[in-house]
Amino acid sequence: MIKSLQRFVGSDAFGGVILIIAAALAMILANTDWTSHIYQAFLNTPVEVHVGSLHINKNMLLWVNDALMAVFFLMIGLEVKRELVCGSLASARQAAFPVIAAVGGMVVPALIYLLFNGQDAVASTGWAIPAATDIAFALGVLALLGNRVPLALKVFLLALAIIDDLGAIIIIALFYTSDLSILSLAVAGAAIVALALLNLFNVRRVGLYILVGVVLWTAVLKSGVHATLAGVVIGFFVPLKEQDGKSPARSLEHALHPWVAYMILPLFAFANAGVSLDGVTLSGLFSLLPLGVIAGLFIGKPLGISLFCWLAVKLKLATLPQGTTFKEIIAIGVLCGIGFTMSIFIASLAFGDADPALAVFSRLGILLGSSLAAIVGYLLLRRVLPVQKAVA
């Protein structure tokens, strides 16, 4: 009994359970009269950092989303790089699979949303809301299945979600960002060059990559682009090749894993899942905006991912990840309908100033669509994934 409990606490499934508990707690606190103001006060607590002439002043919510989540994306970057170099994405046709899947997972949900809202000039600006995937929550749900999930399937989700996030960042920059700082982007470019040079000269001190990475993160943050992108870039440049039996990338990935699973992701869930339902009515649920979001996330995501994957295999543009089945890909497609925080962020950019009522209705659609995707995606994966024999 004790050994079983120890195995569970040390498993990915335990991290998924903590994340879901944190999300549920946030929803309760945000929608209870005597705790909602405490919850909001915590999220809005200002935290300032001064280093010379550099001044960063963000509230607690933004520090979690921009700083801590950059660490999460650093670990994701390390994992994807490992699979690109020597794993399930090592060939061009294997690597093309998640790229094609991500394109389908963005295009089809956006088109379905526009089927519902294309005639409304204001509502149609939210077309990108169902195109996003919340990688943290999707991985949290996947983690509930523990060692039943093949590594290739997890890497497929990671790669797909990263490309999806990159697509969302590009969409935000092109359609929802009024001004970008050219100077900050230039500094970010210089930092990327510095990381490339460190890798080129086989510098194996992880601390140097982190130091340059902090400069990169700060520049990206100041540029107006989503700062978590810096984490992925850093992860791609940390050396993977073993020397004297040690790999900097593998060592860093191993060191980050418990911090990400048991602290960063639960904090992220707690800070972002507390969406107030104040002003949401049952009649609002059946308006075109939330229905378009729900259909885009719950139907458009799996349809787009599955259809584009099927076409890619049939046209011999890509191959299924080794050891996976098409049923598993469909189930992962459903799971990718968890838009949640990235969708809420895009909705706030699309409707926050123009129409607060539309922002409320879009949140309702995001919550329902993402919840449906999480529950059905988990149940489908539980059904299609083989059960692993317990180790005595």
Curated annotation (Swiss-Prot):
Localisation: Cell inner membrane
DNA-binding recorded as keyword: no
Bilayer topology: Multi-pass membrane protein
Catalytic activity: Na(+)(in) + 2 H(+)(out) = Na(+)(out) + 2 H(+)(in)
A GO cellular-component term linked to this record: plasma membrane
TM annotation in the entry: 8-28, 60-80, 96-116, 126-146, 155-175, 181-201, 206-226, 255-275, 279-299, 329-349, 360-380
BP term (GO), one: regulation of pH
Recorded superkingdom: Bacteria
InterPro entries: Na/H_antiporter_dom_sf, NhaA
Job description of the protein: Na(+)/H(+) antiporter that extrudes sodium in exchange for external protons.
Name of this protein: Na(+)/H(+) antiporter NhaA
